[in-house]
């Protein structure tokens, strides 16, 4: 007979092991009730490469501006103004136009109509070609437009010069965005990191050579941007045409793409409006800050907040792309339940992501604002703004994901109406009232923005919950 003194511990260990496994099982079940773990893992794995890709492409024009800014104060002001104007009047529009492919290619891939992805890509590139030509013509009147906006004549002249040499890169950027959506909707994303990082490195080297070694000075920076964007487009385009991964979705150039231009426009124009309406709202805040009392302080504060929001949104962009792809693929396959599950997971992940960003901001706000300014006044004012900024970042994270869902579903027109109403009929009037009438200044402007984003997020959420989810019929778009 076994000695109880030696047998009991073995029994206790066995029971303890069962208890431990039971606790783990209950914990796992609890987590599974809150969020689908496998879906969350898939979306996070998808999001990271998209975040890196977005950051690398975003940094191409920014690094060129940095090289130009070291030539003097006038060059800094001109390059910064030009880059801001190019973004809101051209690059953002091109990003928006490519949003049609998130619907058409995403649902087409889910429906296993693989050949049509290449057709829709070509159709979207034709649309981008036309609009890039129109925008480039518009850009040649930059100096006159800045004059009408009461900008400093010398800065306006420098900005117009910068735009002139950056204009050739716009078409390449438009084509590039279309190819990115084409790859994104097929979940072929890992190579995008390499194809975005290499052009960034090339841009840094090219800008240095053109600005300092070749002696081109100021115009060398925008020329470098244009060259790098063309390299980015041509390299990624060559990869798509030659890689075996796309043998079913890219079957060569086809005249059939012209038949789908109108269908593309019905989605791409509202998608572009979605993006631009939001971009313009932030630029309007900076403009309003500039006409307030003590414009240096107020403009600096709003600009820091806008840049912080933009950097935060780069993280959200990855989740937005994941949500758009998962939803469009599932709807294309006729799986509405799967699309809704993916949406639920995306929204929950957006809240977790926003919480992480907000914690970092609230804890390290002094160090963060110190990267932008050494002014004690600006640091103090930013400290009082940080909770408002935290609120806007959280709401923007939610709306970013819901906007991705909307693109996947083909709801671009409805979202355009929502953005127009919430930002320009609610947010901006409240911003002007709080900023000027109540004399809250920069804080008042941000309160108005929060009101706009809150109404936008709420509207998108209600639309997502109550609107009927159906597969897009391209014949009736």
From Swiss-Prot:
The source's domain of life comes to Eukaryota
Which CDD domains does the entry link to? Answer: MATE_eukaryotic
Give its localization.
Membrane
Coarsely, its chief localization is: membrane
Which keywords fit this entry according to its UniProt record? Membrane, Transmembrane, Transmembrane helix, Transport
> Region annotation Disordered: residue ranges?
1-27
Topology relative to the lipid bilayer, per the entry, is: Multi-pass membrane protein
GO BP: response to toxic substance; xenobiotic detoxification by transmembrane export across the plasma membrane
Q: Name one GO molecular function term.
A: antiporter activity
The record's statement on gene disruption is:
Aberrant lateral root formation due to hypersensitivity to toxic compounds.
Gene Ontology annotations for the cellular component aspect, listed alphabetically: membrane
Transmembrane region(s): 48-68, 76-96, 129-149, 161-180, 188-208, 213-233, 260-282, 301-321, 352-372, 382-402, 414-434, 446-466
Composition bias of kind Basic and acidic residues appears in 11-22
Q: As annotated in Swiss-Prot or TrEMBL, what is the tissue specificity of this protein?
A: Expressed in the root epidermis and cortex. Not expressed in hypocotyl. Detected in the elongation zone of young roots, but not in the meristematic region.
Instruction: State the protein's purpose.
Output: Required for protection of the roots from inhibitory compounds. When expressed in a heterologous system, confers resistance to tetramethylammonium chloride.
UniProt family annotation: Belongs to the multi antimicrobial extrusion (MATE) (TC 2.A.66.1) family.
Q: What is this protein called?
A: Protein DETOXIFICATION 19
Provide the species name.
Arabidopsis thaliana (Mouse-ear cress)
């Amino acid at each position: 007979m076994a000695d109880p003194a030696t047998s009991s511990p073995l029994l206790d260990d066995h029971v303890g092991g069962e208890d431990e496994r039971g606790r783990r099982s209950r914990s796992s079940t609890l987590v599974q009730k809150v969020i689908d773990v496998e879906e969350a893992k898939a979306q996070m794995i998808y999001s990271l490469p998209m975040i890196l890709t977005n950051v690398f492409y975003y940094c191409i024009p920014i690094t060129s501006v940095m090289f130009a800014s070291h030539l003097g104060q006038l060059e800094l002001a001109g390059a910064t103004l030009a880059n801001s104007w190019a973004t809101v009047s051209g690059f953002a529009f091109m990003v928006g136009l490519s949003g049609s492919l998130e619907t058409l290619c995403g649902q087409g891939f889910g429906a296993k109509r693989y050949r049509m992805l290449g057709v829709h890509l070509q159709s979207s590139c034709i649309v981008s070609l036309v609009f890039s030509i129109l925008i480039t013509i518009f850009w040649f009147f930059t100096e006159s437009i800045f004059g009408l906006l009461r900008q400093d004549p010398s800065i306006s002249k420098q900005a117009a010069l910068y735009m002139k040499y950056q204009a050739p890169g716009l078409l390449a950027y438009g084509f590039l965005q279309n190819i990115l959506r084409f790859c994104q909707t097929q979940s072929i994303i890992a190579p995008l990191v390499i194809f975005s990082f290499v052009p960034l490195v090339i841009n840094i080297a090219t800008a240095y050579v053109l600005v300092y070694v070749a002696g081109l000075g100021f115009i060398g920076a925008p020329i470098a941007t244009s060259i790098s964007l063309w390299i980015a487009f041509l390299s990624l385009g060559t990869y798509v045409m030659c890689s075996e991964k796309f043998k079913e979705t890219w079957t060569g150039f086809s005249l059939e793409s012209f038949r789908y231009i109108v269908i593309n426009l019905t989605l791409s124009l509202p998608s572009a409006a979605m993006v631009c309406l939001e971009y313009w709202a932030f630029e309007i805040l900076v403009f309003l800050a500039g006409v307030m009392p003590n414009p240096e302080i107020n403009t600096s504060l709003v600009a820091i907040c806008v840049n912080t929001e933009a950097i935060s949104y780069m993280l959200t962009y990855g989740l937005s792309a994941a949500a758009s792809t998962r939803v469009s693929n599932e709807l294309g396959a006729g799986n509405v339940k799967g699309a809704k599950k993916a949406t639920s997971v995306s929204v929950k992940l957006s809240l977790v992501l926003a919480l992480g960003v907000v914690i970092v901001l609230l804890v390290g706000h002094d160090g963060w604002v110190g990267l932008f300014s050494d002014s004690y006044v600006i640091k103090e004012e930013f400290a009082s703004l940080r909770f408002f900024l935290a609120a806007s970042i959280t709401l923007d994270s939610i709306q970013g994901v819901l906007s991705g869902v909307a693109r996947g579903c083909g709801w671009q027109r409805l979202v355009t109406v929502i953005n127009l109403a919430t930002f320009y009929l609610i947010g901006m009037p409240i911003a002007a009232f709080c900023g000027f009438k109540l004399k809250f200044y920069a804080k008042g402007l941000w309160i108005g923005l929060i009101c706009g984003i809150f109404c936008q997020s709420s509207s998108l959420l209600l639309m997502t919950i109550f609107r009927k989810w159906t597969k897009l019929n391209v014949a009736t778009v």
